[in-house]
Amino acid sequence: MSWDQVWIDVNVASMDPSVSAPYGAIIDAALAVKDGKIAWVGPRGELPEFDVMSTPLYRGKGGWITPGLIDAHTHLVFAGNRANEFEKRLQGASYEEIARSGGGIISTVKACREASEAELFELGRKRLNALAKEGVTTVEIKSGYGLDTATELKLLRVARELGKHHHVDVKTTFLGAHAIPPEYKDDVEGYVDLVINEMLPAVIAEDLADAVDVFCENIAFNIEQTERVLTAAKDAGLDIKLHAEQLSNLGGSTMAAKLGAKSVDHIEYLDEDGVVALSKSGTCATLLPGAFYFLRETQMPPIDLLRKHKVPMVLASDYNPGSSPLCSSLLMLNMGCTLFRLTPEEALAGMTRNAAKALGVEDKVGVLAAGMQADFCLWDISTPAELAYSYGVGVCLEVVKDGHLVHQ
């Protein structure tokens, strides 16, 4: 066999559902890479013969290899911060009260409208580096802090440029319907028209988005407005997803599922009818414990119902300046378990296999199997559960992206 690299003295948490062991685990494993893809993975004793003299051999010292982590919901391209609102919330103001008073998303919109693409790129690069150091190899980045055509395009251009200049794969999502801008506060339908008839065609013309998202909530867009935007996006050939049931149950998840959404996100107030709709459509449920924690929410997502109806659960950081300024995927693994009572295996699946499904890239990443992209991490852990159990001790030893060692 002729391979580009071989890894031995490792255990592999493949996350491959066809492997019956928890985590898809292979103890005392070997993994071979060829042309940026996994060429072989399995028990070391079954490793085919290869040219030891000409093949780089990496020894994992008994550590664990997992798929590269996937953060499937972020807003990491933005300017400014909202530390002042953090203080207000601690003094008793709610997220909704701050938003209605012109704070929240709108304050970040002002900063983003004023920032240059170069400034936004540098800010985004630093945040992407932080995620990459924790083993993230694929990330989704949303717009939504422009709320006018020029700034929405600017944010998406920056996200695309980050993907071109960083080893982390970037999937972009157009979230023009994130909030109602001040200039349209008395004409929400007019703003929805702008999103559909001006912003969306401009985004498509520059090939700036892989998907379209909407914030469906009482303080944002109602069901009818949301459906208009998602239908237009679907008709244009883009994937669709939705912020839904975060603060109340408007039925957005059921509507999005009927349209074939890749995921619905937040879903603290999702009911069983909505869960059943997700199950029937194959739509993923994206859990965002960072926002739940930071906003000090008490309504938990319906984890038991999602399990009962076998809805794929995704775990993501929701990194953003207002409700989850927590740029750490490993922290989300811990929070997913401690706050939402996920098992460590469910949490890891939520940042690998299921996250890939939510982004429509499950044929490329998310599990370690022959033919998949060689995106994986070596961890200094004795069991995969440690990734969720412990935090902050620097257990990510090495990251391989497309067969290239990018972090050591």
From Swiss-Prot:
Q: Broadest EC class?
A: hydrolase
What remark does the entry make about the cofactor? Binds 1 zinc or iron ion per subunit.
What terms describe the molecular function in GO for this protein?
A: imidazolonepropionase activity; iron ion binding; zinc ion binding
GO cellular component, alphabetical, reads: cytoplasm
Which UniProt keywords are given for this protein, alphabetically ordered? Cytoplasm, Histidine metabolism, Hydrolase, Iron, Metal-binding, Zinc
The UniProt catalytic activity note for this protein reads: 4-imidazolone-5-propanoate + H2O = N-formimidoyl-L-glutamate
Record localization: Cytoplasm
Binding, 4-imidazolone-5-propanoate: 82, 145, 178, 246, 323
Q: Where does N-formimidoyl-L-glutamate bind?
A: 145, 320, 322
Main role?
Catalyzes the hydrolytic cleavage of the carbon-nitrogen bond in imidazolone-5-propanoate to yield N-formimidoyl-L-glutamate. It is the third step in the universal histidine degradation pathway.
Q: Which PANTHER family match?
A: IMIDAZOLONEPROPIONASE, IMIDAZOLONEPROPIONASE-RELATED
State what protein this is by name: Imidazolonepropionase
Q: Which organism is it from?
A: Shewanella woodyi (strain ATCC 51908 / MS32)
Upper taxonomic classification of the species? Bacteria, Pseudomonadati, Pseudomonadota, Gammaproteobacteria, Alteromonadales
